[in-house]
Amino acid sequence: MELNFKSIIFLVFVSLTLYWVYRILDWVWFKPKKLEKCLREQGFKGNPYRLFLGDQYDSGKLIRQALTKPIGVEEDVKKRIVPHILKTVGTHGKKSFMWVGRIPRVNITDPELIKEVLTKYYKFQKNHHDLDPITKLLLTGIGSLEGDPWAKRRKIINAAFHFEKLKLMLPAFYLSCRDMVTKWDNKVPEGGSAEVDVWHDIETLTGDVISRTLFGSNFEEGRRIFELMKELTALTIDVIRSVYIPGQRFLPTKRNNRMRAIDKEVRVRITEIINKKMKVMKSGEAASAADDFLGILLECNLNEIKEQGNNKSAGMTIGEIIGECKLFYFAGQDTTSTLLVWTMVLLSRFPEWQTRAREEVFQVFGNKTPDYDGISHLKVITMILYEVLRLYTPVAELTKVAHEATQLGKYFIPAGVQLMMPQILLHHDPEIWGEDVMEFKPERFAEGVLKATKSQGSFFPFSLGPRMCIGQNFALLEAKMAMSLILRRFSFELSPSYVHAPFTLITMQPQYGAHLILHKL
């Protein structure tokens, strides 16, 4: 009897051991090889799967090597920004894949397939599973949602970004841009010139714009929150770049503790501002409360709740509103600052376009304060900004995940496969833009984006489809205001000390700053 019991225990133990051995082998080997076979049978090419590492080690090595030396101003930025993608496409062709650990990441470069991926957001979603608890302290708000929760949140936030609401933010844009121009004015003698690292000041500008537009009269408090968010961003990037060890982010390390402390302080500070706003709104002064983005967001949230029969679950909670404020800081600052700095660098290299842009600003505004109607008529500056976004795409690639087995065009995509859409490759593709693709030619956008891309939908610096960046118009409006004030006061050129070294720090930034010679007009 005792022997039989021991035999049963032994058999159960062996069975469980074999089961878990199989599960582990399936996870680390059989499943990746099955996915690889499926892709190869459809004509996709890539390196053979390697246990655990995939292509990540080699990709990281290529990126580190690319960042060791700058490039010439006329050289292709892709070899510094996406050397790993260039190597994959160069070796295996456009129809290729890379390995991210045990997951294949397929390159999608066909504009029609990209439109399908970005339009069918319910099938192809963000890879949230790669985010650990610490990283999620930063990546919050609508960007972290999918499906119905995303649709509900987007409806509320869309109302806050309506162009009539954006008009209300124009004075904040002007004040922040004026402050930066005044700062430069004090550095440059009358009728003279001076070298300025404009990148540092542009970062400060876009941070101030976020603080002013988000919190209005609580601007100084907003500045403190911005500094905290900037520190949290730097720490998060450090986490993303480090080797992932399961459970490591739960450990009470100095970095983890600091990130949690920042998150707690940011939440407390934003909550205090929200409570002040809510108190004003409840006192019947809703109009005075809705003079900044936070007030507008709270107003839109209350309106949505009322429209749904005072159903509070139809709106956002205080915690969710805090998440949107954090996302606004994180996403709203980087894109505009990189757009502005590369615009100034390119206009330094092409003075004829700088002159055309300046003439347009004086023609539209003279010496008056730029207004919404005038900014909407800045055709030359719009062309220039689009061309800068094409050549120096803020985010080089987008990645989605097939959360279920699905058909993409003529291809079958198994569940779990990642789809990478390298915008920068499409934006630099001579088959789409012509042989002059790497030249700075804003005139290619003279008749709009559709005409420039031959209606192919191959220009998407702010993504495409229902999940297109909600802050696109905000960023462009801010950039036009800034360039209008800069061009009226200064001409500029590259300094001899300028070092051309674009690199990716979430967005494409100048690794060693942007040293320009400013000439006071």
Swiss-Prot record:
Classification via SUPFAM superfamilies:
Cytochrome P450
The membrane-topology field of this record reads:
Single-pass membrane protein
Phenotype of gene-disrupted mutants: Reduced secologanin levels but accumulation of 7-deoxyloganic acid.
TM stretches of this protein: 8-28
Q: State the GO CC annotations.
A: endoplasmic reticulum; endoplasmic reticulum membrane
Tissue specificity field: Mostly present in actively growing aerial organs, including leaves, flower buds and stems, and, to a lower extent, in mature leaves, roots and opened flowers. Expressed in the leaf internal phloem-associated parenchyma (IPAP) inside the mesophyll.
> Which major enzyme category is it?
oxidoreductase
Mind listing the UniProt keywords for this protein, alphabetically?
Endoplasmic reticulum, Glycoprotein, Heme, Iron, Membrane, Metal-binding, Monooxygenase, Oxidoreductase, Transmembrane, Transmembrane helix
What processes in GO biological process is this protein linked to? indole alkaloid metabolic process; response to jasmonic acid
- Entry's InterPro entries? Cyt_P450, Cyt_P450_CS, Cyt_P450_E_grp-I, Cyt_P450_sf, Cytochrome_P450_Monooxygen
Q: What is its EC number?
A: 1.14.14.85
Q: For binding heme, which residues are annotated in this chain's numbering?
A: 469
Q: Which residues are glycosylated?
A: 107, 311
Q: Where in the cell is it found?
A: Endoplasmic reticulum membrane
Q: Which GO terms describe its molecular function?
A: 7-deoxyloganate 7-hydroxylase activity; 7-deoxyloganin 7-hydroxylase activity; heme binding; iron ion binding
> Quick one: where is this thing mainly located?
endoplasmic reticulum
Q: Which domain of life is it from?
A: Eukaryota
User: According to its UniProt record, which reaction does this protein catalyse?
Assistant: 7-deoxyloganate + reduced [NADPH--hemoprotein reductase] + O2 = loganate + oxidized [NADPH--hemoprotein reductase] + H2O + H(+)
Q: In which pathway does it act?
A: Alkaloid biosynthesis
Q: Its induction, per UniProt?
A: By jasmonic acid (MeJA).
Q: Which Gene3D superfamilies match?
A: Cytochrome P450
Q: What does this protein do?
A: Component of the seco-iridoid and derivatives monoterpenoid indole alkaloids (MIAs, e.g. vincristine, quinine, and strychnine) biosynthesis pathway. Catalyzes the conversion of 7-deoxyloganic acid into loganic acid. Not active on 7-deoxyloganetic acid.
Query: What is stated as this protein's family in its record?
Result: Belongs to the cytochrome P450 family.
The family database entries (PANTHER family) matched by this protein are listed as:
CYTOCHROME P450 CYP72A219-LIKE, CYTOCHROME P450 FAMILY MEMBER
Protein's name in the database: 7-deoxyloganic acid hydroxylase
Lineage of origin? Eukaryota, Viridiplantae, Streptophyta, Embryophyta, Tracheophyta
The encoding gene is 7DLH
